[in-house]
Amino acid sequence: MKIYTIHSNSHEILYTDYFLKTLPDEFDVISTQIPQECSTGDFYKPGWDITCYRKVELFIRACEDNMGEKFIFSDVDIQFFGNIKDILIEELGDYDIACQNDTGNMYCSGFFICDANERTLNMFKKMKENYNSEDQTSLNQQIHLCKSKFLSKRFFTIGHITHSVWNGQDIDIPKDILVHHANWTIGTNNKINLLNMVRKKIDYNG
């Protein structure tokens, strides 16, 4: 199965030191590097919308290249804690797409498993045609076009606990997580600190 990801120079350290370093040997990695159109790489800074638009373009290409098969998309601010392929397939079941739960009934466009079919391809194309600010808003506005569900909270974000932006506070982390997505914080340095905190807690508990 293919796992797709995309990043610019500001997120290279996340790609090499966290995503690739912890990714289980179950996938063919299809990585796309894009220009640094957002100078900081930070959430909603100038150029962020263009960067997110590149993700939507990638969703379309990935779907077209895998018709009749399943694929995964993952942001690079993600680390893994074991094998996930079979669990993702099981959780997807007969749905078209299963996304990380970003809390508040919001589907996260930063980590999902997708059955590449006409419904999901149409959804991704509608996201591009009706693009609204960034990829996640666009996904949630068009996801009704296919059969969707949330992944279990083993596919973890700190937002499951805090429901607010993380600024360095100590948090107890569930012991059974399989994936940690370092969203719900702003800036590459904060993402690194959050990834390290979660890794340390899981390694200690293990």
Which sequence ranges carry the predicted segments?
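Catalytic core and acceptor-binding pocket of nucleotide-sugar-dependent glycosyltransferases
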Residues: 118-206
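Short, solvent-exposed loop/turn segments at secondary-structure junctions
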Residues: 9-11, 36-38, 78-79, 103-106, ...
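GT-A fold catalytic core of metal-dependent nucleotide-sugar glycosyltransferases
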Residues: 51-107, 111-121
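A structural signal for short, well-ordered beta-strand segments and their strand-loop junctions
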Residues: 28-33, 72-75, 98-99, 149-152, ...
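Short, flexible loop segments at the rims of nucleotide/cofactor-binding pockets, characterized by
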Residues: 46-50, 77, 130
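N-terminal anchoring/stem segment of glycosyltransferases
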Residues: 1-69, 116-118, 173-174, 188-206
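Short amphipathic alpha-helical segments and helix-helix/interface helices
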Residues: 17-21, 59-60, 85-89, 136-140, ...
